[in-house]
UniProtKB/Swiss-Prot annotation:
Segments for region (Disordered): 958-981
Membrane topology (UniProt): Lipid-anchor; GPI-anchor
GO biological process: peptide catabolic process; proteolysis
Protein name as annotated: Aminopeptidase N
Gene (UniProt): APN1
PANTHER family in the record: AMINOPEPTIDASE (PTHR11533:SF290), PROTEASE M1 ZINC METALLOPROTEASE (PTHR11533)
EC class (word): hydrolase
Residue numbers marked as site, Transition state stabilizer: Y452
Active site, per annotation: E367
Residues annotated as signal peptide: 1-19
Subunit composition and interactions: Homodimer.
Residue span(s) of the pro-peptide: 998-1020
Organism: Anopheles gambiae (African malaria mosquito)
């Protein structure tokens, strides 16, 4: 039985994340439409080359290098004295190149380097012969296009030449190019290292080069550095030579042909762990945190070797991993030397969470997959970056699942990749998978959710269509054919096609290329509409492009592989029954009885949504109420996600979607609850702070009551599976947010026991929920304990979690004091934060709930503090904070606070920014009275009324429990219920998030969404 929650003052803004860590071909679907078995065309038309294909966009080709010369080999030498924090470096590079068209100009890339000298020689006997000096060359730079032009004293006829250049530069401080990083040693000394991040266009910051992915060459690298430091690069060390009294030059073996963006080198005092040809480098005080990364790397490389049939050591003799303290991305797949941010490689069982371990494992799998997809075969141009990132995203879960069978890693793919991709790809502004770019900014923008998650989803769909054996054979053919070269999408299709010729895998006359072009050249994705004729058994299916927030007529046509199950034949695990929709609509003949449900897209392997007529939705809903496990868990998750987004787009009555979600009262598995978390978080964010919010909490309470009662939230068992841990975190977060006394008391007790020394440290796997909700009622001593724990920790993932937890406090004075530490003020000593951690403090406070938002507003109202805020954290951080405040503004009182803040900030907020902030906030206020808001409110009111009828009569005295303290009130007509695991409390909702990163390049979000503090009882 559900408890009736009557709530007045509630506050939380929830943030969903996943994570983490963004030339077009004018090709149509097919020349002549093939006949597809099992479906008759209802559209009356034929898919053509023009229908639905995204138009080619104009790009500035002046950013591309001329094709008059191409590189063959680079002989690169660099000298750095980073051991004493010297930021200048010097270098020389000898570039063997082929002139293919007579010219006197050799044009390459350069960003910020200063040339000292340059000369050109001919190589009449090829690259192995002695050079013949032609003379010194003139050079000029173009900072707009980042080109450097070397002009020869004579015309260079087609042939082989050597360009030798001396240069100098400065190590960057923005985690890009050749840059400086640092860490604090155990003795308190700050130690420096020099490292690289060249993808996508930053090799040109370290040496002049042909910095395009298709222009592959071999490299020999040598680096002069301190004797106390070690240099590593893509290839094994060949030899060393000591020079001067304290310097050494390390020489490396010659690389295979590779793209410039894959070159890497690190100069540091790091230590290593070794297993065969694999090594993991870490700062000395993190040495014991490298064990899992080494173990996982060995396992994952072995399964990829076997799966792809091309052993890694065919081309590369070693594979190193290194954790860099300052690293902008999640990781970088440099061939033979993979670089990571520390949180994506280091694992400490004493403090790291199950999510942290999963992030490490998936990131390693992602980067190891790149050793084939991106390194062995690189995209000819950034237009095809999905050939790298799509495969890496697929295999970060698939390879990990093969390496650790039975650990349930593959179960994460649907929620963290497919459903997340659809949420992003349903926007009108999305792009096709194939998409041209020219400028560095445009190229960087291609590393988005289309390149990663959508592409991984589409490739997973094709893997299921072709079958695993054909898939592996096709990939081996593709990789073998294009090894050490660039590739375009059509070459992948040819490789896959070669594996299925004559096998009848696809309909007669249909090719892999014809299918894939509709998915790679088309923006967005389809919704498959299913309408049943219950009298005849026939089913009409049709397709249209899906938009998240609207229903727009369109002519888009995809070749959609579909299958279906029904109640009497629920064979969800069979994938040899695909049929195809290649037109706008078709009729399917079935014998499914009218009283049985039908579900399309088994296990959601197809990258599309499915909508049904309302009666079929009703049949599905009723079936799940009777037996929640009668439909496969991944399809239950799909149904929840589809119903939610279909309702938001206007394709499905919102009440139908919400009625369907009521089956969650009985749901016991991770995947459906994670899908539901997305929908519930959206509704929570919209309704928080409104009069309708208490009805929403009644609804959520009804859904989670039973599952919460079955879970243990204050202890971790060795038998707990990965998915069980995800489920516990999701449900316990909602339960504590809903004010479940049991949840709040347990989290508070665990934190208090640890802080006072009367109990053990909280287990890492439940720490984020425990610390956050324990912090709601924490005293100053407990707040200070957690703050000191954060400051003393050297594990960056743990520090981030603790920062987020401190932001959960309900005490505005605590929060404002916490903010001052991010500015380095208020203590008289330097605060040991990294730059990104200072920004994280701000994020944690405004994400912690309405109390945190109000604390931030009050803080920024102080002119002296806002000046220091901008000086320390930058104007962009201020703007991000203002945007967060506006997005968390849901009522008139909160709007007044926002307006007062904008006024107080004066010229720091320009008129356009102020208008945008007010527009965002007003849209939140208007939503509740719009169509979607009214539909939701109506359903929730009816649900609450029905719930009230089944609720026991209230006693005169109501006990409201928040954490470990109890307040008793006696209103004239108080209402409570006492069934279930808790008595009535008031609260705000926080939801869990998925940390992606899987994709390894994907940027990172907050692990927990935090709630407000004030507890009130609605007085009758």
């Amino acid at each position: 039985m559900v408890r009736l929650l009557l709530l007045v003052s509630l506050g939380l803004c929830c943030l969903l994340a996943s994570a983490d860590r963004p030339p077009y071909k004018s090709s149509g679907i097919y020349e002549e439409e093939p006949q597809l078995p099992g479906a008759s065309d209802l559209s009356g038309g034929v898919a053509s080359d023009e229908i639905g294909v995204a138009p080619a966009q104009a790009v500035d080709e002046r950013y591309r290098l001329p094709t008059t010369s191409i590189p063959i080999h680079y002989d690169l030498h660099l000298r750095t004295e980073i051991h004493r924090n010297e930021r200048t470096f010097t270098g020389t590079v000898g570039i063997q190149l082929q002139v293919v068209q007579a010219t006197d100009k050799l044009v390459m890339h350069n960003r910020g380097l200063v040339m000292s000298s340059a000369k050109v020689s001919s190589l009449p006997n090829g690259v192995t012969g002695a050079p013949t000096l032609i003379g010194d060359v003139q050079y000029s730079t173009d900072t707009t296009f980042e080109h450097i032009t070397f002009t020869s004293p004579t015309i260079l006829q087609p042939g082989t030449y050597l360009l030798e250049v001396a240069f100098q530069g400065r190590l960057a401080t923005n985690d890009d190019g050749f840059y400086v990083s640092s860490y604090v040693a155990d003795n308190g000394e700050r130690r420096y290292l020099a490292t690289t991040q060249f993808e996508s266009t930053s090799a040109r910051m370290a040496f002049p080069c042909y910095d395009e992915p298709g222009l592959k060459a071999t490299f020999t690298v040598s680096i002069t550095h301190s004797l106390s430091y070690k240099a590593i690069s893509n290839m094994p060390q060949k030899t060393t030579t000591d020079i001067e009294t304290d310097m050494r030059t390390t020489f490396f073996e010659k690389t295979p042909a590779m793209s410039t963006y894959l070159l890497a080198f690190v100069v540091s005092d790091f230590q290593l762990r070794l297993s065969g040809a694999q090594r993991v480098y870490v700062r000395p005080n993190a040495f014991n945190e490298a064990t899992f990364a080494l173990e996982a790397g060995v396992k994952i490389l072995k399964v990829l070797d076997d799966h792809l049939g091309i052993p890694y050591d065919t081309y590369m003799p070693k594979l190193d991993q290194i954790a860099i303290p300052d690293f902008a991305a999640g990781a970088m797949e440099n061939w033979g030397l993979v670089t990571y941010r520390e949180q994506a490689l280091l694992f400490n069982p004493a403090v790291s969470t199950y999510r942290g371990k999963t992030n490490v494992a998936t990131t390693i799998a992602h980067e190891y997959a790149h050793q084939w997809f991106g390194n062995l075969v690189s995209p000819e141009w950034w237009e095809y970056i999905w050939l790298n990132e799509g495969f890496a995203t697929l295999y970060e879960f698939y390879a990990l699942d093969m390496a650790y069978p039975g650990q349930e890693y593959w179960e994460l793919f649907n929620q963290q990749v497919i459903q997340y991709a659809m949420g992003q790809d349903g926007q009108a502004s999305t792009r096709p998978m194939n998409w041209n770019a020219a400028t560095p900014g445009e190229i960087s923008a291609l590393f988005d959710r289309v390149a990663y998650d959508k592409s991984g989803s589409v490739l997973n769909m094709m893997r299921h269509v072709l079958g695993d054996d054909n898939w592996k054979a096709g990939l081996k053919a593709y990789l073998t054919d294009r090894a050490l070269q660039g590739a375009v999408d059509e070459q992948l299709y040819a490789g896959l096609q070669s594996a299925i010729e004559g096998k009848g895998v696809l309909p007669n006359g249909v090719t892999v290329a014809q299918i894939m072009r509709t998915w790679t050249n088309e923006a967005g994705y389809p919704v498959l509409n299913v309408r049943r004729s219950y009298d005849t058994g026939d089913v009409i299916i049709s397709q249209e492009r899906f938009y998240n927030d609207r229903k727009v007529p369109n002519t888009n046509i995809w070749m959609i592989p579909y299958n279906y199950v029904h109640q009497a034949k629920a064979d969800f695990n069979e994938f040899d029954d695909f049929q195809w929709l290649a037109t706008k609509a078709a009729r399917i003949e079935t014998t499914v009885p009218a009283n049985e449900w039908i579900v399309f897209n088994k296990q959601q392997v197809g990258y599309y949504r499915v909508n049904y007529d309302e009666h079929n939705w009703e049949l599905i809903t009723n079936a799940l109420h009777e037996n929640w496990a009668s439909i496969h868990r991944l399809n239950r998750a799909q149904l929840i996600d589809d119903a939610y987004w279909l309702a938001r787009s206007g394709r499905l009555d919102l009440r139908v979607a919400l009625r369907f979600m009521t089956y969650l009262r009985n749901e016991r598995e991770y995947a459906p609850w994670t899908a539901a978390n997305v929908a519930l978080t959206y509704f929570n964010n919209r309704l928080r702070g409104t009069a309708e919010y208490h009805n929403f909490l009644i609804f959520v309470d009804a859904l989670i009551e039973d599952i919460y009662s079955l879970l243990t939230i204050d202890a971790v068992s060795p038998d707990d599976t990965l998915l069980h841990k995800y489920l516990v975190q999701t449900i316990s977060t909602w339960a504590c947010s809903m004010g479940y006394t049991d949840c709040l008391m347990k989290t508070a007790a665990l934190l208090k026991a640890e802080a006072s020394g009367t109990g053990p440290a909280v287990h890492p796997d439940i720490a984020s929920v425990t610390y956050c909700y324990g912090m709601r009622s924490a005293l100053e001593s407990e707040f200070q304990y957690l703050y000191r724990k954060m400051m003393n920790s050297k594990n960056l993932a743990e520090r981030t979690m603790l920062i987020d937890s401190l932001g959960c406090s309900n005490n505005k004075e605590f929060l404002k004091a916490f903010l001052t530490t991010a500015l380095g003020s208020g203590t008289g000593v330097e605060i040991n934060y990294r730059a990104d951690e200072r920004r994280r403090v701000v994020q944690a406070i405004y994400s912690g709930g309405r109390t945190g938002v109000d604390a931030l507003i009050e803080f920024l109202m102080d002119p002296a503090l806002v000046n220091e805020f901008v000086s320390t954290l930058s104007t962009s951080t201020l703007n991000s904070a203002l945007s967060a405040i506006a997005s968390r503004t849901n009522n008139v009182e909160e709007m007044n606070k926002l307006n007062a803040l904008i006024t107080a900030l004066g010229s720091r907020v320009n008129s356009q920014t102020a208008a945008n902030l007010r527009t965002t906030a007003q849209a939140n206020l208007d939503w509740v009275n719009g169509f979607e808001g009214l539909m939701l409110s109506n359903f929730l009111a009816e649900f609450a009324a029905e719930t009230l009828l089944t609720t026991t009569a209230a006693p005169e005295t109501t006990t409201v429990t928040a954490g470990p303290t109890t307040t008793t009130t006696t209103p004239s007509s108080a209402v409570t219920t006492t069934t279930g695991p808790t008595s009535v409390t008031t609260t705000v909702v926080q939801t869990t998030t998925e940390e992606d990163d899987g994709a390894a390049t994907i940027g990172l979000s907050i692990a927990a969404l935090l709630v407000s503090i004030t507890v009130h009882l609605l007085m009758g």
